[in-house]
Amino acid sequence: MSQHSQYGVPGVPAQSSLSFTQGFLLGQLSVVLLIGAFIKFFIFGEAPAPPSRGLASRTASHHRSYSINQGDNNANNNTNNGSSPRTLREKPSTSNVLRPVPSSATNTRSILRKTYYNAIPTQLSHTKQGRHRIQHSTHQPESLDWFNVLIAQTIAQYRQTAYLLKDSPTSSILDSLSAAINDPQKKPSFIDTIKVTDISLGEEFPIFSNCRVIAVDDSNSDGGRLQALMDVDLSDDNLSLAIETSLILNYPKPRSAVLPVALSVSVVRFSGTLCISLIPASTPQSPSSAPTPDAGNLNMRSLFQHISAELNGTAPNPTATNPSGKKGVPKTNLAFSFLPDYRLDLSVRSLIGSRSRLQDVPKVAQLVEARIQSWFEERVVEPRVQVVGLPDFWPRMGRTGVRPGDDVEAAAAAAAASVSSRSGGGPVEATTLSGSAEEAIIDDSPVRPGLRFRGSATATAGRSDSSFEEIPRASPQTPLDIPGSMPRVVRTP
């Protein structure tokens, strides 16, 4: 019994203590393993591969493989071209930060391959100018339903704007058209003043369809030039113009005889193939930049005005007289024309004479139709094209607006914050918003007599008048606001 109590009893606590230690260590080890697995597979794990761009049937043809050999080939190409690949250890040059674009990136075949467009030439034909033109491509023609909606909205907006400005003395379409057709340098002397009696901008919209992209030979671009062909059709529309004038006989004396003439021309139907392509500007223009005034010739206040104007984007635009860009770089132009197989059906009605009138003379209709056809072919029918410069689509604060119906206070706060961040923390004061435009009026000029707030029933709570209120100017003891200082907090009621 004594031996059992001496050896057996103390042995039980020893076994329980050993099992607790083992369990504690096992639990700690499992927690460490879980944390390590989480860090390895969830935090430092590789991102999954992005989904394929094309359809499931085109996945195999669109698959791109990147291998070590391909990288070696690219490195060899760069070495042969004279430009070695830049490594992280090399210090970049301050004069050549932008990496050169390889010539193959702007090639026509490279663009078609990277955009998965099959424009392989299947039939070549010689044009009158000796160029090769691809008749069609292997890519399926595309419908332009979305493009028709956008064009219809644009034309409808133009029609509405022209009708709203019909009584404007300077922006009326009637005055502009009258000034164009009565140009003394183009109008013959035997035609009296032309008076526009009726204008109809139509009610229907052109329908574009069957769009396809082809590659044409162009000596000015590497690998040819891409061109989009689309069919356009406009029919059953009420697009017409009616005028009145007089034919003057100036022999043997001026205005010896006058013959009144009334004409009405309507477009019955127009159909054709529109060609659109992007071409660079032909000749770069020299830059015209506004010189920066010398700080020694200006006082402190004028210098602050100039710096504040440059920071806030209100400085004179150096590209106002240079449409090609800030530094003379040519812009990209949009060239469009119609193929010679177009169809233009016109309806010409005429009324000649004052007492005994001749109505709808066939010879007059033929002369008018021939003149309109010649005018159209001299401008937009191949090989002649119309070149239009594309606008600048870079986001700018001056073109930023707020959609109608949004929160006015949120729009004012967003506009004030954006202008403040752009001006580098300069003093910016935002006025209340008018109910019509819902745009913040920003003023940061430190030398104006005072800021004016335009009140409105929707912008100012409890204030129904829309008069201007003058804010008293700061006292002479007030320190001068310097751009770059902390902005003042303006609370709008």
UniProtKB/Swiss-Prot annotation:
Comp. bias (Polar residues): 93-104
This protein's UniProt keywords: Endoplasmic reticulum, Lipid transport, Lipid-binding, Membrane, Transmembrane, Transmembrane helix, Transport
Region called Disordered, residue ranges: 52-104, 420-493
Residue ranges of the TM segments: 24-44
Bilayer topology term: Single-pass type I membrane protein
A GO CC term assigned to this protein in UniProt: ERMES complex
Signal peptide (from-to): none
Topology, Lumenal side: 1-23
GO BP of this protein: mitochondrial genome maintenance; mitochondrion-endoplasmic reticulum membrane tethering; phospholipid transport; protein insertion into mitochondrial outer membrane
One annotated GO molecular function: lipid binding
Cited InterPro entries: Mmm1, MMM1_dom, SMP_LBD
Predominant cellular place of this UniProt entry's protein: endoplasmic reticulum
Record's compositionally biased regions (Low complexity): 69-81
Function field: Component of the ERMES/MDM complex, which serves as a molecular tether to connect the endoplasmic reticulum (ER) and mitochondria. Components of this complex are involved in the control of mitochondrial shape and protein biogenesis, and function in nonvesicular lipid trafficking between the ER and mitochondria. The mdm12-mmm1 subcomplex functions in the major beta-barrel assembly pathway that is responsible for biogenesis of all outer membrane beta-barrel proteins, and acts in a late step after the SAM complex.
Domain notes: The SMP-LTD domain is a barrel-like domain that can bind various types of glycerophospholipids in its interior and mediate their transfer between two adjacent bilayers.
Family membership noted in the UniProt record: Belongs to the MMM1 family.
HAMAP family found in the cross-reference section: Mmm1
Assembly and interaction partners: Homodimer. Component of the ER-mitochondria encounter structure (ERMES) or MDM complex, composed of mmm1, mdm10, mdm12 and mdm34. A mmm1 homodimer associates with one molecule of mdm12 on each side in a pairwise head-to-tail manner, and the SMP-LTD domains of mmm1 and mdm12 generate a continuous hydrophobic tunnel for phospholipid trafficking.
This protein's name: Maintenance of mitochondrial morphology protein 1
Organism lineage string: Eukaryota, Fungi, Dikarya, Ascomycota, Pezizomycotina
Gene designation: mmm1
